[in-house]
Design a protein with these regions (language model features):
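Helix-loop segments that flank and shape redox-cofactor active sites
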Residues: 39
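Non-catalytic cell-wall polysaccharide-engagement segments
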Residues: 2-21, 28-36, 44, 48-154
Length: 154
């Protein structure tokens, strides 16, 4: 995905997340592959290259009971119902970025109690990754997002 297209999408679909933060998260989560699928505790032999392949893979994972995340923001299937997502909509770049914004904002609001903005953001990134404020730090996710943010700023 071209940088200008992503910037437009981020500003339109996730306006409450700084574009640099959105870009860093998407860099780490999906590498800008709108059809990316991450399998929790597993891995795909290769990433889908089309919407049809992605939907077939999602259906197979769901039928087998796997926990997985999809799209630009790698939204986890456990969040689909509460965010009003379907496998089809979660693959839409704008919908994925909007869902990313919702999850990240929820995490940030929970993390912000008495913290500096940067501490709260790092805690929110950990929460985005894992649902809590520590796992994303321990597993290096927060560091990868921070690094992606710094690299993209150059």
């Amino acid at each position: 995905m071209e940088a200008a297209i992503f910037l437009t999408l981020a500003m339109t679909c996730a306006p409450q997340v700084h574009p640099d933060t959105a870009r860093a998260i998407v860099t780490v989560e999906s590498g800008f592959n709108r059809y990316a699928i991450g399998v929790v505790g597993g891995a795909l032999e290769r990433q889908p290259r089309s919407r049809g392949e992605a939907l077939a893979t999602i259906n197979a994972l769901a039928a087998a009971g796997w926990n997985y995340s999809v799209g630009l923001g790698q939204i986890n299937v456990a969040n689909f119902a509460r965010l009003g997502l379907t496998p089809e909509s979660a693959l839409d770049p704008c919908v994925s970025l909007a869902a990313m914004q919702t999850v990240l904002r929820e995490c940030y609001e929970r993390a912000n109690g008495g913290s500096t903005q940067q501490v709260a953001l790092r805690r929110a990134l950990s929460c985005y990754y894992s649902g809590n404020f520590t796992t994303g730090m321990r597993h290096g996710y927060v560091g990868r997002v921070v690094t992606a943010s710094r690299l993209g700023a150059n």
